[in-house]
Regions:
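Active-site beta-loop-alpha substructure in enzyme catalytic cores
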Residues: 1-63
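C-terminal beta-strand edge segments of enzyme domains
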Residues: 1, 66-127
Length: 127
């Protein structure tokens, strides 16, 4: 986890997004930041999982996905900012674009206090 501008970020890389256990929130971060290289055939999976991680962890999610082509694949982009309710705040579509948005940690804390689902998660240890 890193903190920047008063926001605590959990860092994920590409394929990590597929595994909810890696991003399990215990109230210790405010946003997920995921840099990725998801190919175009899996664009809907990328978009869906980014939203799912935000919803299930009651956090913001920022996903930066590759665009363009290489000999192995075409990359669709679809970078996005998603809020803790799964609503898209900004999206880049298929091109290169700088996305901006405000991660309101006060609104996030109020939502978590009103609906503290993250407290009901089972404790476990990964080995």
């Amino acid at each position: 986890m890193v903190e920047y501008g008063g926001v605590r970020f959990l860092l994920l890389v590409c394929y990590d997004l597929r595994f909810p256990v890696w991003s399990r929130c215990r109230g210790d971060y405010d946003a997920i930041l995921c840099c990725a290289s998801w190919p175009a055939p899996r664009r809907e999976v990328w978009r869906t999982l980014l939203r799912a991680r935000a919803i299930e962890n009651q956090c913001y999610a920022a996903g930066a996905n590759r665009v363009g082509d290489d000999p192995a694949a075409r990359y669709a982009g679809d970078s996005a900012l998603v809020d803790f309710k799964g609503r898209t705040m900004a999206e880049a579509g298929g091109g290169e674009r700088i996305l901006t948005g405000v991660f309101d940690t006060g609104a996030l804390a109020a939502f978590r206090e009103k609906f503290p689902a993250w407290r009901d998660a089972d404790e476990f240890v990964l080995k």
